[in-house]
Regions:
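Conserved catalytic-core motifs of GNAT/GCN5-like acyltransferases
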Residues: 103-111, 235-250
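Acyl-donor-binding surface of acyltransferase catalytic domains
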Residues: 6-131
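Polar/acidic, low-complexity leader/linker segments enriched in S/T/G and N/D
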Residues: 1-4
Length: 250
């Protein structure tokens, strides 16, 4: 699905204030951040001091000009393949300290490698549109499926139901007009029945039909979630590091 990668490069170029050619080449790039139209608004801070992606074996930095210039001097020759390591996080924290910021998190992100759907046996499937999703606000069973954010609204969902009980929910948030992020919750009593894989693959296929790119993010250490992504037809495409104010991080 080469067209998906092309759309990814276009999206990352907007998010990181660079050219598509900068995403594709083999050099590290450092840009001053601007809030460009069409950017993903995933965990977006009011002011972006620094964020970094590792993609295609290289790095793209964007943020406040003074911070970016320090990063350029320190990381120009670093490999993207080995950058997302605790030792580099500590170096970034030292650079960010005077601004009152530090590394917040780093996640691997996945994009579709196929449009296949994995059926789930013995369950009822129900789909929800943006308006219908609102009934689940403040329902902590679905804290991964939905974010209820004005910046990245929840727009589509699919549930697995057994004996009139929702046992799994996958939701998609519109992080940008062309990239929707998928989240998933499954009742612990029903884990191991491939419900997560099925729901994520169904939502993936529905989003692709809208000519929008579904994507999936998780933690480095959440191996179960990474397995769900792989089984649902996703492959890892980039790693993203974001920063936040110290007072908000504790």
């Amino acid at each position: 699905m080469d067209y998906i990668k092309e759309k990814l490069y276009q999206q990352l170029a907007i998010d990181y204030c660079c050219q598509v050619s900068d995403i594709k080449d083999d050099k590290n790039h450092f840009t001053e951040y601007e809030k460009l139209k069409g950017r993903r608004q995933f965990e977006e801070a009011a002011d972006c001091v620094l964020k970094v992606i590792a993609v295609n074996g290289k790095l793209i930095f964007t943020g406040k000009k003074s911070i970016i210039e320090v990063c350029r001097k320190q990381f120009s020759n670093n490999s993207g393949n080995w950058f997302m390591d605790a030792s580099n996080f500590r170096k970034l924290d030292e650079i960010l300290m005077n601004e009152g910021y530090r590394v917040k998190t780093a996640h691997p992100f996945f994009i579709p490698k196929d449009d296949c759907v994995h059926e789930i046996n013995g369950v009822e499937i129900k789909k929800y549109n943006q308006e219908e999703i609102l009934q689940f606000k403040d329902d902590d069973r679905f804290d991964e499926a939905f974010c209820f954010s004005e910046e990245s609204p929840d727009v589509l969902a699919v549930a697995a139901i057994i004996d009139d009980e929702i046992v799994g929910m996958a939701g998609a948030s519109a992080d940008s007009p062309s990239f929707w992020q998928i989240g998933i919750n499954v009742n612990k009593n029903f884990e191991g029945r491939h419900i997560a894989t099925g729901l994520v693959s169904m939502l993936k296929a529905d989003i692709l039909k809208k000519e929008i790119v579904p994507y999936y993010g998780t933690s480095f250490s959440n191996l179960a979630s990474q397995h769900v992504a792989a089984k649902a037809g996703f492959e890892v495409a980039w790693v993203e590091l974001i920063t936040g104010r110290m007072e908000f991080l504790g």
